[in-house]
């Protein structure tokens, strides 16, 4: 599942980076509709939740390995 999640994150990141210059242009002109901002905020929130969950999994795995290593050292 990690590979699929990373692939999805990469796709979303590329999509966001492609749309960022256009949105910046709109912000400079002052003509961005609020729903695009809402979509951007929602996308960031979803990415944040996914990133946090992946980080928690990685930390759990690391803690398991570190515990096993400590027991092996002792």
Swiss-Prot record:
- The residues on the Virion surface side of the membrane are 1-34
The alphabetized UniProt keywords are: Membrane, Transmembrane, Transmembrane helix, Viral envelope protein, Virion
Chief place of localization? virion
For this protein, the parts annotated as crossing the membrane are 35-55
Q: Name one GO cellular component term.
A: viral envelope
Q: Which residues lie on this side of the membrane: Intravirion?
A: 56-73
Where is it located?
Answer: Virion membrane
Membrane association type = Single-pass membrane protein
Entry's family note: Belongs to the chordopoxvirinae L1 protein family.
**Entry protein name:** Protein F9 homolog
